[in-house]
């Protein structure tokens, strides 16, 4: 069954009328309407857990920009919370997780819960957003990768050195594998629940895969992501195929390995040229990306030029979803995002109509 949505078509490398665009963190603090809604919620996790408000912030960039896909508004750290950890977001400090997972016994205490129960607020949001979208564009569900989740759980929050989690990886690999296996089980169950409730594509964010060497990335990150992909429901109850996107920041050198994971789309950061990467793996998977997010600090004219450069580098071939190479930052201009979306739509149409 072929989808009517150009985003889904592009995920499966089918012909499209123009290149689809969505943006990581497209719902966020750079939007004044988001800041107003977050203030109404009280704090970030309260916003994630309020069905009406989570739906509202998901829809805000769709109404403003006419993007080609919506992405569920939530946070990757809902999984550690569901497994028994206390997760809070301290102002100016980022996430704090307590108690941190430091030894084998800590890992054994983590509980595998049914996301239909422990993360029921996410499922309500998925269903609510699907209704609000009214089938006009598809909804992307998401999760953090097992490795990225493990970094927060072992470090107890964000880290610059990743000393604790890497120490476990090197000194106690059996403990790290147990943690990653538990997380892979939970991530797969979580994404399958999102699919049951209406997610039409899913993305796994491996934000911290790039801090690993290539051998350790294969063993400790990619292996666990593949375990998740292998367990995902790739067709929903309506008979629609569900594309799977893997985005591993800082891992463009590993694209061949990632393309063999079973995913449909490989997300790229901005550090490599998309044209040569398409030549290497574009016959296997679609590619998502990969404009430097910092271009949004430039003038609208330079932003449009940057968008054209990415689109022209990929060319008129099937299988490209335009995105940034990482998420939106809070201090980016909504007007500059509008200039980007407009440029991608105009140039993406020309490329696929053969007039670029």
UniProtKB/Swiss-Prot annotation:
Cited Gene3D superfamilies: 3.20.20.210
Domain of life: Bacteria
Gene Ontology molecular function, alphabetical: uroporphyrinogen decarboxylase activity
GO cellular component, one term: cytosol
Family membership: Belongs to the uroporphyrinogen decarboxylase family.
EC numbers on record: 4.1.1.37
Top-level enzyme category: lyase
Subcellular location, record wording: Cytoplasm
Biological process according to GO: protoporphyrinogen IX biosynthetic process from glutamate
Pathway named in the protein's UniProt entry: Porphyrin-containing compound metabolism; protoporphyrin-IX biosynthesis; coproporphyrinogen-III from 5-aminolevulinate: step 4/4
Name of the protein in its database record: Uroporphyrinogen decarboxylase
């Amino acid at each position: 069954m072929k989808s009517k949505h150009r985003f889904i078509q592009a995920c499966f490398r089918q012909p499209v009328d123009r290149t689809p665009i969505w943006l990581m963190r497209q719902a966020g603090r750079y939007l004044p309407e988001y800041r107003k809604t977050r203030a109404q919620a009280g704090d970030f996790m309260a916003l994630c857990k309020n069905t009406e408000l989570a739906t509202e912030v998901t829809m805000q960039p769709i109404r403003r920009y006419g993007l080609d896909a919506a992405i569920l508004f939530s946070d990757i750290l809902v999984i550690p919370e569901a497994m028994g950890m206390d997760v809070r977001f301290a102002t100016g400090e980022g996430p704090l997780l307590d108690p941190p997972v430091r030894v084998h016994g800590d890992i054994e205490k983590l509980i595998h819960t049914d996301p239909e129960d422990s993360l029921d607020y996410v499922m309500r949001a998925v269903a609510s957003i699907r209704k609000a979208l009214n089938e006009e564009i598809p909804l992307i569900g998401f999760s953090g990768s097992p490795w990225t989740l493990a970094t927060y759980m072992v470090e107890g929050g964000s880290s610059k050195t990743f000393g604790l989690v890497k120490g476990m990886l090197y000194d106690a690999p059996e403990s790290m594998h147990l943690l990653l296996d538990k997380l892979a089980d939970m991530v797969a169950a979580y994404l399958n629940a999102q699919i049951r409730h209406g997610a039409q594509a899913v993305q796994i964010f491996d934000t911290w895969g790039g801090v690993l060497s290539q051998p350790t990335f294969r063993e400790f990150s990619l292996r666990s992501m593949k375990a998740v992909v292998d367990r995902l429901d790739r067709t929903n109850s309506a008979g629609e195929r569900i594309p799977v996107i893997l985005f591993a920041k800082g891992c463009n050198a590993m694209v061949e390995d990632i393309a063999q994971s079973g995913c449909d789309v490989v997300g790229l950061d901005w550090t490599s040229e998309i044209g040569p990467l398409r030549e290497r793996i574009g016959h296997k998977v679609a590619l998502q990306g990969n404009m430097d997010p910092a271009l949004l600090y430039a003038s609208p004219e330079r932003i449009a030029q940057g968008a054209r450069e990415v689109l022209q580098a990929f060319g008129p071939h099937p299988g490209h979803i335009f995105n940034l190479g990482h998420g939106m930052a809070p201090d980016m201009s909504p007007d500059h995002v509008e200039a980007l979306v407009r440029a991608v739509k105009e140039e993406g149409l020309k490329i696929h109509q053969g007039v670029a």
